[in-house]
Amino acid sequence: YWWSRYWMYSDHELRELCKNFENYNIPLDVLVIDMDWHYTDKGRGSWTGWTWNKELFPDYRKLLKDLKADNGLRVTLNLHPAEGVRSYEEQYEAVARDNGVDPATKQEIPSKKSFIKSMFRMF
């Protein structure tokens, strides 16, 4: 069973949600974390985003590890890669270099074949 809901969940709320699935004996195999796993506010994101929202997920690595260990869950993130990578993303410098762009230019890395290759290597 997959769970997906367009909602601004926090780390704590997702943990509680998973406990409720377990308490009510509802099977859950895959948890989809929707848009707000990354920043979506003006100036730091939009539909496309690559930097974890630290206000909602202060330690996302621990969350993902715990969901797997405690609940056996697979987690997938809702991605909208159409806008490529912008200069405010944490991974921008590495992605820019990987795509032959000088990071100092702050040029957007468009969503094209070379970017997709970088996406799978770096994200």
For each predicted feature, which ranges?
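Aromatic-lined carbohydrate-binding/catalytic grooves of carbohydrate-active enzymes
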Residues: 1-123
